[in-house]
Amino acid sequence: MFDCMEALGMGPRQLYDVTNRGACMLRKASPFYAGLDPFAWTGTASVRSVETQSTSSEEMVPSSPSPPPPPRVYKPCFVCQDKSSGYHYGVSSCEGCKGFFRRSIQKNMVYTCHRDKNCQINKVTRNRCQYCRLQKCFEVGMSKEAVRNDRNKKKKDVKDEVIPPESYELSGELEELVNKVSKAHQETFPSLCQLGKYTTNSSSDHRIQLDLGLWDKFSELSTKCIIKIVEFAKRLPGFTTLTIADQITLLKSACLDILMLRICTRYTPEQDTMTFSDGLTLNRTQMHNAGFGPLTDLVFAFAGQLLPLEMDDTETGLLSAICLICGDRMDLEEPERVDRLQEPLLEALKIYARRRRPNKPHMFPRMLMKITDLRGISTKGAERAITLKMEIPGPMPPLIREMLENPEAFEDQSESTEKKPEPEPPAPPPPALLTMKKEQEDEDDSWATENGSEPSPEEEDDDDEDGEEERGTDSDGEAWGGQEPNADVSRKSHGGRAQ
């Protein structure tokens, strides 16, 4: 075979080239070029077959991912030649120079150079002269406007993140609770704008120990205010469902707190005065002389702290209710029940305050912190009541004595200053807080029916024994009879005291 090829003047390689060229021409001329291979039919040109298979197998292998682009390299910091972190405020700069320039512009910093205002600024010396560093920032092209725009953008982002007021919605039950508490507060405590102010010139220039005229007026107004606080408490949802003992305990514990909160909301900072419920307006000196004494400056300071809170009547009423219905008071019979009654009040004040001030979420905790301040003032007030008893010529008004003083401490003071005709066992504390408006309990009604007379609001009912009603119909001693073996002595003592 090779001899024939040699006779034609063609070697094996030349024959393969001719055959290969013919096959290529055939494939290009065929409409089925993509799927036909003449060598596959004839079985010749095995080398070409292997080459075709190799090429097809390479096409099936997935190509490798392209390599990541090289990290972007910035020019060195234009200010100090340190490594740059990017373009900031218009020029390539490092993090240190970026922050320095931003702080200097935002805070309007004024620097001073202690040399010739031409200090060299580089990576090592940049912190030695702030004046020259800032000047170089300007020289290389850093922009003030870029800093301001960046600051405004941040402020806008913060505003966009604020939860809209619509998200602070009171449920139906809480809305009803807020309305009831607000109405109870407004109807028992008129606002400052509803009062006709009037003043007095009594001892308004200098402080004295006690102005008896102002004291008489102050004690009269305080008694009326205490009655209004009791009425406010009775109108709070759920308060009257507590035990009688717990109602009395809560009122005694919180009455001075609420009294101080109410009077401090009528503070006028321009004149440095406070206005009472009848419109009487006293300045700081007159408040001192009316009986506040060393408590005066503390009360006025607290009134000034309330001003930034800008509390409305609803918030004042809710805070008063929270202060009153508080389960951590001493001697409560059912503190857990009191706490459960307080929880919706706390939730209502939180939602109401945030809905009223959506951009000031800190106002609610600041309001609650005022309860602690009020308790501190109340403690000082109880101490002041003891010393005030020594200054006034007559007895302390009953309600003020009951509300503003520690009963045990008062008894100790009164025993040391007054001589009693004969000792007698102390009577239980009178339930005057719950009988302000002649509303007696069922026991009082039955007592009055059996004896034909009404009990004194300063006496507490005792259990009567058989026969006691008949011989005590003409004396106040009937309420005290039948309790101890020395009933006759007790009746005489109380009868004489009533006269």
From Swiss-Prot:
CC terms in the record's Gene Ontology section = nucleus
Q: How does it assemble?
A: Heterodimer; with an rxr molecule. Binds DNA preferentially as a rar/rxr heterodimer.
Q: Which GO terms describe its biological process?
A: cell differentiation; liver development; negative regulation of transcription by RNA polymerase II; pharyngeal system development; positive regulation of transcription by RNA polymerase II; retinoic acid receptor signaling pathway
Location of the region described as Disordered in the Swiss-Prot/TrEMBL record: 51-70, 409-499
| Record field: compositional bias (Acidic residues) | 456-477
Zinc finger (NR C4-type) residue numbers: 77-97, 113-137
Is this entry keyworded Transferase? no
Q: What induces it?
A: By retinoic acid, in embryonic anterior brain and eye.
Residue ranges constituting the NR LBD domain according to the UniProt record: 173-407
What job does the chain carry out?
Answer: Receptor for retinoic acid. Retinoic acid receptors bind as heterodimers to their target response elements in response to their ligands, all-trans or 9-cis retinoic acid, and regulate gene expression in various biological processes. The rar/rxr heterodimers bind to the retinoic acid response elements (RARE) composed of tandem 5'-AGGTCA-3' sites known as DR1-DR5. Required for hindbrain development and for the development of pharyngeal arches.
Give the start-end ranges of region Hinge.
Answer: 143-172
- Pfam families for this protein: Hormone_recep, zf-C4
Molecular function terms from GO: DNA binding; nuclear receptor activity; RNA polymerase II cis-regulatory region sequence-specific DNA binding; zinc ion binding
Question: InterPro entries in the record, alphabetically?
Answer: NHR-like_dom_sf (IPR035500), NR_DBD_RAR (IPR047159), NR_LBD_RAR (IPR047158), Nucl_hrmn_rcpt_lig-bd (IPR000536), Nuclear_hrmn_rcpt (IPR001723), Retinoic_acid_rcpt (IPR003078), Znf_hrmn_rcpt (IPR001628), Znf_NHR/GATA (IPR013088)
| Annotated protein name in UniProt | Retinoic acid receptor gamma-A
Write down the SUPFAM superfamilies for this protein, in alphabetical order.
Answer: Glucocorticoid receptor-like (DNA-binding domain) (SSF57716), Nuclear receptor ligand-binding domain (SSF48508)
Q: Which residues bind DNA?
A: 77-142
Give the superkingdom in one word. Eukaryota
Please give the family membership noted in the entry.
Belongs to the nuclear hormone receptor family. NR1 subfamily.
Per the record, which residues fall in region Modulating? 1-76
Ribonucleoprotein found in the keyword field = no
* Keywords assigned by UniProt, alphabetized: DNA-binding, Metal-binding, Nucleus, Receptor, Transcription, Transcription regulation, Zinc, Zinc-finger
- UniProt free text on domains: Composed of three domains: a modulating N-terminal domain, a DNA-binding domain and a C-terminal ligand-binding domain.
State where the protein is found. Answer: Nucleus
Its organism's taxonomic lineage begins at: Eukaryota, Metazoa, Chordata, Craniata, Vertebrata
